[in-house]
Amino acid sequence: MRIGANGDETVWADEEFAGRDFRDEDLSRIRTERVVFTECDFSGVDLSESEHHGSAFRNCTFRRSTIWHSTFTNCSLLGSVFTECRIRPVTFVECDFTLAVLGGCDLRAVDLSDCRLREVSLVGADLRKAVLRRADLTGSRVQDARLEEADLRGTRVDPTFWTTAKVRGAKIDIEQALAYAAAHGLAVHGG
């Protein structure tokens, strides 16, 4: 761990934490580089204005945590659970959320382009106007997820996505339009 010259920036690099209880700690403006957190509890933690590069948050708990104004670049949030968190605005660049639980989270207008969200629970999540270009949502649970006016172009999804998520006004590509039609029982024929 290094403390910045002005005393307000803490940098953690190449460290590992397993089962660590960070509950209610102030980790705002922290910077992590290649740090691995396994089964850590971040409940009530303030991670606002933090930066994370190549770090992994594996099976961690985020309950009533604050991560707004933070940046996650090439991070793994595999199996982590987010409940009642203040998330947006936030930046995620090529992050892996496989098996994470984001059900009920407010992700309006968040850019999740190129992120992996395989088998993620987005049940009841609010992703209105979110950008999910080229994201991988295969196997994700999206019952009652709000994706109205979201940008879904190039996103990989299962057929059930089109019948369970609310997608009115979403931007989709031609291939997705055909998948949407097929999922709703329409027979699409050329000419």
From Swiss-Prot:
Keyword presence, Transcription regulation: no
UniProt keyword list: Antibiotic resistance
UniProt key word Nucleotide-binding: no
Pfam families noted in UniProt: Pentapeptide_4
Annotated ranges, domain Pentapeptide repeat: 115-154
UniProt superkingdom: Bacteria
Gene knockout outcome: Decreased resistance to fluoroquinolone antibiotics ciprofloxacin and sparfloxacin.
GO biological process, one term: response to antibiotic
Family named by the database record: Belongs to the pentapeptide repeat protein family.
Quaternary context: Homodimer. Probably interacts with DNA gyrase.
UniProt comment concerning the protein's domains: Each subunit forms a right-handed beta-helix with 8 complete coils that stack upon each other.
Protein task: When present on multicopy plasmids confers increased resistance to fluoroquinolone antibiotics such as ciprofloxacin and sparfloxacin but not the quinolone nalidixic acid. Forms a structure that exhibits size, shape and electrostatic similarity to B-form DNA; it may bind to DNA gyrase which is postulated to protect it from fluoroquinolones.
Name by which UniProt lists this protein: Pentapeptide repeat protein MfpA
Organism: Mycolicibacterium smegmatis (strain ATCC 700084 / mc(2)155) (Mycobacterium smegmatis)
Gene designation: mfpA
